[in-house]
Swiss-Prot record:
This is 4-hydroxy-tetrahydrodipicolinate synthase. The gene is dapA. NCBIfam families: dapA (TIGR00674). Belongs to the DapA family. The active site is at Y137, K166. Its EC number is 4.3.3.7. GO terms for molecular function: 4-hydroxy-tetrahydrodipicolinate synthase activity.
C-alpha cells in the first residue's frame, strides 16, 4: 500500500473557459494558485466538476501540465483520467504520469454499465499501467453503476497502487461497510460536501470537494475541529456551511460553482454544452448564500 498523502481537502477544480469556450490555461493556473492559498491540500484536474466529458485528450493533458507547473510540489495534483473506455484511460493515465501529476482518479465507467467483474478488470488494468497512486471514484448517480464494497476490497488487496476511493454514492451504510472491510491505510474520501463530517466520524480522511472553491479554509477548520476532538465546533461549522454545500447543487454541477467563482471575480467563464449557464434566479440564490456566509 502506498504511503502517499493526498491531503484532507482536495478541490475538484473547475475548468476555466474563454468567451469562445476554449480552455483558458492561464486562468487555470491562477485558479489553482488561489485554491492552494485558500485551503486546498490538493486538486483534481479534469474530474466531473472540471467538465471532463467535454474536454478532449489534448486539452486534458495541457490542463495537467498547467496545474503541475503552477502548484506542483506545493499541492497534490490528481489527474482525472477515468472514462468508459479502458484503453483511452490507459493512454491518458500514462500522459498524466509523464507530465508530473501526483496521482490519478478513475471514475467508474459510465453508460456501458459493466458487471462488478468488469469494474474490477477495468480499474486493475488501468492501475497496472502506471506507478502513480490511484483513487477510485464511485458516483452511481452519474455513472449508472455502483462500485460495491466487495469490489473495492478486491482491488485494495490485489493492486498495490490503488490506495483510495472518492465515495459519492450518498449512502452512509455503504461507507460503513467500506471502512469495516478495507485495510486501515486505504483512504476513503467523501465525495459529497454535506457528508464530510458524518464520514469523518466513520474513519474517512477528508473530502474531494466542490465547496472548497469557495470555503476551503472553513472546511479545513471543520476537519481540524473534528480531528482535535472538538466535535461540537465541527458540528457547528458543518451546520454553518450546510447552505453552501447544498446551494452549489441547485442545478447540475459545476454550473452553480462557476457562477459563484465568477461572482468572486475569479473569471472562470461559462460551461460547455450540453450544460447551460445558471439562470438569473439561480445566480441570485448562490449570491445570497455566499453573502449570508460572508464568502463574497
Amino acid at each position: 500500500m502506498s504511503t502517499v498523502d493526498f491531503g484532507r481537502v482536495i478541490t475538484a477544480m473547475v475548468t476555466p473557459f474563454h468567451p469562445d469556450m476554449s480552455v483558458n490555461y492561464t486562468q487555470a493556473k491562477k485558479l489553482s494558485r488561489y485554491l492552494v492559498e485558500n485551503g486546498s491540500d490538493g486538486l483534481v484536474v479534469s474530474g466531473t466538476t472540471g467538465e471532463s466529458p467535454t474536454l478532449n485528450k489534448d486539452e486534458k493533458i495541457q490542463l495537467f501540465k498547467a496545474v503541475v507547473e503552477e502548484v506542483g510540489g506545493q499541492a497534490t495534483v490528481i489527474a482525472g483520467t477515468g472514462s468508459y473506455d479502458t484503453a483511452s484511460s490507459i493512454i491518458l493515465t500514462k500522459e498524466a504520469e509523464k507530465v508530473g501529476c501526483d496521482g490519478v482518479m478513475l471514475v467508474a465507467p459510465y453508460y456501458n454499465k459493466p458487471s462488478q467483474e468488469g469494474l474490477y478488470q477495468h480499474f486493475r488494468t488501468i492501475a497496472e499501467c502506471t506507478s502513480l497512486p490511484v483513487m477510485l471514484y464511485n458516483i452511481p448517480g452519474r455513472t449508472g453503476i455502483n462500485v460495491l464494497p466487495a469490489t473495492v476490497e478486491r482491488l485494495a488487496k490485489d493492486v498495490p497502487n490503488i490506495v483510495a476511493i472518492k465515495e459519492a454514492a450518498g449512502d452512509i451504510n455503504q461507507v460503513s461497510e467500506l471502512r469495516r472491510i478495507l485495510p486501515e491505510d486505504f483512504i476513503i474520501f467523501s465525495g459529497d460536501d454535506s457528508l464530510t463530517l458524518p464520514m469523518l466520524s466513520l474513519g474517512c480522511k477528508g473530502i474531494v470537494s466542490v465547496a472548497a472553491h469557495i470555503a476551503g479554509k472553513q472546511i479545513q477548520e471543520m476537519i481540524d475541529a473534528f480531528t482535535s476532538g472538538n466535535t461540537t465546533l465541527a458540528a457547528n461549522l458543518h451546520k454553518e456551511l450546510f447552505p453552501i454545500f447544498k446551494g452549489l447543487f441547485i442545478t447540475s454541477n459545476p454550473v452553480p460553482v462557476k457562477a459563484a467563482l465568477n461572482l468572486k471575480g475569479l473569471a472562470v467563464g461559462g460551461v460547455r454544452l450540453p450544460l447551460v449557464e445558471a439562470t438569473a434566479k439561480e445566480i441570485e440564490t448562490v449570491k445570497n448564500i455566499m453573502n449570508n456566509l460572508h464568502l463574497l
